[in-house]
Amino acid sequence: MFRTEDSILPPLEWLSDNNSSVPPAIYDWLMELGSMTLRFERYCTRVHVEPRHEYFIARNELKEEAEHLPESSLYWLREVVLMGDNQPWLLGRTVIPQETLAHHSNALMNLGTLPLGRYLFSNGELTRDYIHIGRKDSLWARRSRLRLSGKPLLLTELFLADSPLYTEDPS
């Protein structure tokens, strides 16, 4: 259950909050406050998750993520590829302090192929502290600190080239 591999996410460049280089249609996606899974479902017949990494890491393995999360003895790391009709649309990385896990009976450790949003948005006690926008070359990313029953977790999402974020709305 401890770290054995490197992250599936490449290093990302985080933009300043007043950066105006984000096209409006992209910005709308990146600032989505609801479930990204539900939004993706409007563009395909099936959304599913392929888990890549699920294990505990120490604080010194968080790098810049450490400044967004409280001290904890361990953090649960979950990295997934979110697929739309079997096309990779998003790389997701969730970092959860052990205290957040304990508050939710460790349910967040047992999501398997369930998209994180299905759990978080069905809970009813979810808030979002902020969304930071980032990039990796021509790909867009976002990082959110969420609170589930007041307990923090950090979610980073990189939207891959086939993601509907880069296309027009289906309507």
Curated annotation (Swiss-Prot):
Disulfide bridge positions per record = none
Please state the pathway this protein functions in, per its UniProt record: Cofactor biosynthesis; ubiquinone biosynthesis
A GO cellular component annotation in the UniProt record: cytosol
Segment forming the signal sequence: none
What GO molecular function terms would the record report? chorismate lyase activity
Entry keyword set: Cytoplasm, Lyase, Pyruvate, Ubiquinone biosynthesis
Q: Which reaction does it catalyse?
A: chorismate = 4-hydroxybenzoate + pyruvate
Q: Where in the cell is it found?
A: Cytoplasm
Tell me its EC number(s), please. Answer: 4.1.3.40
Q: Which BP terms from GO are recorded?
A: pyruvate biosynthetic process; ubiquinone biosynthetic process
Gene3D superfamilies recorded: Chorismate lyase-like (3.40.1410.10)
Job of this protein:
Removes the pyruvyl group from chorismate, with concomitant aromatization of the ring, to provide 4-hydroxybenzoate (4HB) for the ubiquinone pathway.
For this protein, the record's PANTHER family field holds: CHORISMATE PYRUVATE-LYASE
Q: What is this protein called?
A: Probable chorismate pyruvate-lyase
Q: Which organism is it from?
A: Bartonella bacilliformis (strain ATCC 35685 / KC583 / Herrer 020/F12,63)
Gene name, Swiss-Prot/TrEMBL? ubiC
